[in-house]
Regions:
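Accessory beta-strand-rich segments of carbohydrate-active enzymes
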Residues: 1-7, 21-22, 27, 32-161
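Short, solvent-exposed loop/edge segments of extracellular or virion-exposed proteins
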Residues: 14-21
Length: 161
Protein backbone atom coordinates (compact mmCIF):
# COMPACT_ATOMS: atom_id res chain seq x y z
CA UNK A 1 0.00 0.00 0.00
CA UNK A 2 1.20 3.48 -0.78
CA UNK A 3 0.14 7.01 -0.04
CA UNK A 4 -0.19 9.44 -2.92
CA UNK A 5 -2.49 11.79 -4.72
CA UNK A 6 -5.53 10.50 -6.55
CA UNK A 7 -5.26 9.87 -10.30
CA UNK A 8 -5.93 12.80 -12.62
CA UNK A 9 -8.92 11.04 -14.15
CA UNK A 10 -11.33 9.56 -11.61
CA UNK A 11 -13.98 7.11 -12.73
CA UNK A 12 -16.27 4.76 -10.98
CA UNK A 13 -19.15 4.88 -8.57
CA UNK A 14 -19.54 3.99 -4.95
CA UNK A 15 -21.32 0.61 -5.01
CA UNK A 16 -23.16 -1.63 -2.54
CA UNK A 17 -25.91 -4.19 -2.63
CA UNK A 18 -28.99 -2.52 -4.09
CA UNK A 19 -31.36 -4.02 -1.54
CA UNK A 20 -29.19 -3.15 1.49
CA UNK A 21 -28.57 0.31 2.79
CA UNK A 22 -26.49 -0.99 5.67
CA UNK A 23 -28.51 1.13 8.10
CA UNK A 24 -29.75 -0.93 10.99
CA UNK A 25 -28.44 -4.20 9.54
CA UNK A 26 -25.56 -5.47 11.62
CA UNK A 27 -22.75 -7.69 10.44
CA UNK A 28 -23.53 -7.34 6.73
CA UNK A 29 -20.76 -8.73 4.53
CA UNK A 30 -20.47 -8.17 0.80
CA UNK A 31 -18.39 -9.90 -1.86
CA UNK A 32 -17.74 -7.80 -4.98
CA UNK A 33 -16.09 -9.22 -8.09
CA UNK A 34 -15.11 -8.08 -11.57
CA UNK A 35 -13.44 -10.05 -14.36
CA UNK A 36 -11.42 -8.34 -17.08
CA UNK A 37 -9.01 -9.27 -19.87
CA UNK A 38 -5.46 -7.99 -20.19
CA UNK A 39 -4.08 -8.12 -23.74
CA UNK A 40 -0.38 -7.85 -22.76
CA UNK A 41 1.79 -7.74 -19.65
CA UNK A 42 2.25 -4.41 -17.91
CA UNK A 43 5.21 -3.18 -15.84
CA UNK A 44 3.05 -1.12 -13.45
CA UNK A 45 -0.67 -0.98 -12.71
CA UNK A 46 -2.34 1.05 -9.96
CA UNK A 47 -5.35 -0.19 -8.06
CA UNK A 48 -7.00 2.65 -6.14
CA UNK A 49 -9.53 1.56 -3.54
CA UNK A 50 -11.64 2.79 -0.66
CA UNK A 51 -14.49 1.33 1.33
CA UNK A 52 -16.65 2.32 4.22
CA UNK A 53 -15.92 0.89 6.66
CA UNK A 54 -13.21 -1.56 5.48
CA UNK A 55 -12.07 -3.96 2.74
CA UNK A 56 -9.79 -6.84 1.80
CA UNK A 57 -8.82 -6.85 -1.88
CA UNK A 58 -7.63 -9.81 -3.96
CA UNK A 59 -6.28 -10.04 -7.51
CA UNK A 60 -6.48 -13.47 -9.12
CA UNK A 61 -6.99 -15.06 -5.71
CA UNK A 62 -3.93 -13.42 -4.11
CA UNK A 63 -4.48 -11.13 -1.13
CA UNK A 64 -3.16 -7.69 -2.11
CA UNK A 65 -4.11 -5.64 0.94
CA UNK A 66 -6.67 -4.31 3.35
CA UNK A 67 -7.76 -0.96 4.67
CA UNK A 68 -8.47 1.87 4.52
CA UNK A 69 -7.47 3.95 7.51
CA UNK A 70 -10.50 4.36 9.76
CA UNK A 71 -12.85 7.03 8.44
CA UNK A 72 -13.74 10.03 10.54
CA UNK A 73 -17.18 11.62 10.64
CA UNK A 74 -16.23 13.88 7.70
CA UNK A 75 -13.55 12.00 5.71
CA UNK A 76 -12.85 8.59 4.29
CA UNK A 77 -9.48 7.49 2.98
CA UNK A 78 -8.23 5.60 -0.05
CA UNK A 79 -5.22 3.42 -0.78
CA UNK A 80 -3.34 2.36 -3.86
CA UNK A 81 -1.38 -0.75 -4.72
CA UNK A 82 0.84 -1.75 -7.63
CA UNK A 83 -0.99 -4.86 -8.83
CA UNK A 84 1.18 -5.60 -11.89
CA UNK A 85 2.85 -8.60 -10.16
CA UNK A 86 -0.60 -10.17 -9.68
CA UNK A 87 -1.88 -9.63 -13.23
CA UNK A 88 -1.67 -12.18 -16.03
CA UNK A 89 -2.08 -11.87 -19.78
CA UNK A 90 -5.64 -12.96 -20.46
CA UNK A 91 -8.41 -13.27 -17.88
CA UNK A 92 -8.04 -11.58 -14.47
CA UNK A 93 -10.32 -11.13 -11.46
CA UNK A 94 -10.47 -8.43 -8.80
CA UNK A 95 -12.38 -9.45 -5.67
CA UNK A 96 -13.26 -7.33 -2.66
CA UNK A 97 -14.63 -8.47 0.68
CA UNK A 98 -16.12 -5.85 2.95
CA UNK A 99 -18.14 -5.91 6.15
CA UNK A 100 -20.38 -3.33 7.75
CA UNK A 101 -20.51 -3.99 11.47
CA UNK A 102 -22.87 -1.01 11.91
CA UNK A 103 -21.47 -0.39 15.37
CA UNK A 104 -23.08 2.80 16.68
CA UNK A 105 -20.32 5.05 18.04
CA UNK A 106 -19.69 8.77 18.24
CA UNK A 107 -16.84 8.51 15.74
CA UNK A 108 -18.44 6.17 13.19
CA UNK A 109 -18.64 7.57 9.68
CA UNK A 110 -22.33 8.53 9.45
CA UNK A 111 -22.92 7.25 5.91
CA UNK A 112 -24.00 3.84 4.61
CA UNK A 113 -21.35 1.29 3.64
CA UNK A 114 -19.90 1.43 0.13
CA UNK A 115 -16.96 0.41 -2.08
CA UNK A 116 -15.04 2.32 -4.75
CA UNK A 117 -12.05 1.23 -6.82
CA UNK A 118 -10.30 2.07 -10.05
CA UNK A 119 -7.49 0.32 -11.93
CA UNK A 120 -5.10 2.39 -14.03
CA UNK A 121 -2.54 1.13 -16.51
CA UNK A 122 -0.20 4.02 -17.07
CA UNK A 123 -2.35 7.12 -16.63
CA UNK A 124 -5.37 5.49 -18.27
CA UNK A 125 -8.29 4.08 -16.24
CA UNK A 126 -9.15 0.59 -17.51
CA UNK A 127 -11.51 -0.72 -14.82
CA UNK A 128 -13.68 0.91 -12.15
CA UNK A 129 -16.59 0.14 -9.89
CA UNK A 130 -20.01 0.47 -11.48
CA UNK A 131 -23.26 -1.47 -11.78
CA UNK A 132 -21.57 -4.23 -13.82
CA UNK A 133 -19.72 -5.58 -10.79
CA UNK A 134 -21.10 -8.83 -9.39
CA UNK A 135 -22.08 -8.31 -5.75
CA UNK A 136 -23.53 -10.78 -3.28
CA UNK A 137 -24.19 -11.08 0.42
CA UNK A 138 -22.45 -14.41 1.09
CA UNK A 139 -24.18 -17.09 3.11
CA UNK A 140 -20.88 -18.54 4.36
CA UNK A 141 -20.90 -16.02 7.22
CA UNK A 142 -24.37 -17.03 8.40
CA UNK A 143 -23.41 -19.70 10.88
CA UNK A 144 -26.77 -19.81 12.61
CA UNK A 145 -25.22 -18.79 15.90
CA UNK A 146 -25.11 -15.52 17.79
CA UNK A 147 -22.15 -13.28 17.06
CA UNK A 148 -20.86 -10.70 19.48
CA UNK A 149 -18.34 -7.88 19.55
CA UNK A 150 -16.37 -6.53 22.49
CA UNK A 151 -18.20 -3.21 22.33
CA UNK A 152 -21.68 -4.63 21.89
CA UNK A 153 -24.10 -7.07 23.36
CA UNK A 154 -24.94 -10.13 21.30
CA UNK A 155 -25.98 -8.87 17.88
CA UNK A 156 -28.11 -11.87 16.98
CA UNK A 157 -29.34 -13.77 19.93
CA UNK A 158 -32.13 -16.03 21.05
CA UNK A 159 -31.36 -14.63 24.53
CA UNK A 160 -32.41 -11.10 23.61
CA UNK A 161 -35.60 -10.07 25.38
Amino acid sequence: MAIGTLPKELKGEWIWLPEKSGRGARDVRVFARKEFVLESSVPFSELWISAIPSYHVYVNGEHVGYGPAAPTRTKCYGDFYDIAPYLEVGSNVISIITCDMAIPTYSRYPHPPKIWCQVNIGDRPVLWTDSTWRMIEPQCYSGGQPRCHAGLEYTESPYRK
